[in-house]
Amino acid sequence: MEAQAQDKAEEGEEEGTRQQHAQAGPVGAAGGGGGGGAAAVAMSAIPMNSWLVPKPEPVEFFGGMAMVRKPPPRNRDRHTKVEGRGRRIRMPAACAARIFQLTRELGHKSDGETIRWLLQQSEPAIIAATGTGTVPAIATTVDGVLRIPTQSSSSSGPASSAVVDGEESSAKRRRKLQPTRAVAGASPLATAAPAAYYPVIADPLLQGSGGAAISVPSGLAPITATGAPQGLVPVFAVPATGSPAVAGGNRMIPQATAVWMVPQPAGAAGAGNQPTQFWAIQSAPQLVNFAGAQFPTAINVADFQQQQQQQPVSTTIVQNSNSGEHMHFSGADSHEQQRRGRKEGNSGGVVDHPEEDEDDDDDEPVSDSSPEE
């Protein structure tokens, strides 16, 4: 009996599943052939292994892709950048157009100047509404005076005086940084003495000449306003030959520690009126080594003569073919004597030699008609 009851229950479950599949088949076919239309998939609980699966929520698809909607357009006013107070500000387009028109009508150079003019015209209304005026951020108040560096020359009297004060303060600041540059027609501060910026220390060596000198801590002698006197002779301090540095044979000459400027004798023009001054240049002691240097020594005359005597003496013999004379020249004779001998040999061919003529006469035959017979 129990087995039959189980078989009937299984058959009932199979029939229920068949009916569910039959109902879901037409719905799937209609959704597939819709051609991109919105379709809702209705699914029922499908028993799996005697467990119930929750029914999924319907999902809408449009052409197989999810559509992203654009946000609505923003409704904002158009703004234009206008120059003002040294930076850019934003304002509605109608206000910007009006400012541009006022700039052309008033003949201003920039829109910022037009905005400044508008603020000046509306100053009473601004004070009545806020209790304060339109003071720029770059303006400063000194001793109850408002100073605006960028104020135009067409402003009121106090503002123009504030500009002048600002220019003077900037000029003073530049003169403090550069005290040596004095401009013609400037204030007395520009031509102030250097003592206002640098300490002046009088040199004790130059107190006799007035002491108007500035000490220079560079190791050099102080320079006076009159300059060096004329007619000075430089004398370099070099150790003598008998000093220990030279006598030792090391040839180590220490560098001069001072250079003294000594005036010329009293016979020079104007030398008696000028005081004697000494100019000293201090330097670190340095040594110069000449041991490795080679210097030319004195020439020994005796060795030179001995070398001349040891040289071989060449003999030149010149024979005169015409006169038969022989001239002997040693190596010590000069080339001029040799040239003279050659000239004499050549001239011998020009001079008549009676002996040669007589020999020629003897060789000639005597004719029959000659008177000698």
Curated annotation (Swiss-Prot):
- Disulphide connectivity of cysteines: none
Which residues fall in a compositionally biased region of kind Gly residues? Answer: 28-38
User: What tissue specificity is annotated for this entry?
Assistant: Expressed in seedlings and leaves, mostly in the lower region rich in dividing cells.
GO MF annotations in UniProt? DNA-binding transcription activator activity; DNA-binding transcription factor activity; protein homodimerization activity; sequence-specific DNA binding
Decide whether keyword DNA-binding is in the record: yes
Which keywords annotate this record? Activator, Developmental protein, DNA-binding, Nucleus, Transcription, Transcription regulation
The UniProt regions of compositional bias labelled Low complexity, in chain numbering, are 152-162
> What GO cellular component is one of the record's annotations?
nucleus
Q: Which PROSITE patterns match?
A: TCP
User: Residue spans with biased composition (Acidic residues)?
Assistant: 354-373
Q: Where in the cell is it found?
A: Nucleus
Domain TCP span(s) in chain numbering: 75-129
Primary site of residence = nucleus
Composition bias, kind Basic and acidic residues: at what positions?
325-345
Pfam families given for it? Answer: TCP
The record's region (Disordered) falls at 1-38, 149-182, 322-373
Kindly state a single biological-process term from the GO annotations of this entry.
positive regulation of DNA-templated transcription
Role this protein plays? Transcription activator. Binds the promoter core sequence 5'-GGNCC-3', especially at sites IIa (5'-GGGCCCAC-3') and IIb (5'-GGTCCCAC-3') (essential for meristematic tissue-specificity expression) of the PCNA gene promoter. Can target the TCP motif 5'-TGGGCC/T-3'.
Q: How does it assemble?
A: Forms homodimers and heterodimers with PCF1. Interacts with SPL14/IPA1.
The protein's name: Transcription factor PCF2
Native source organism of the sequence: Oryza sativa subsp. japonica
Q: Gene name, please?
A: PCF2
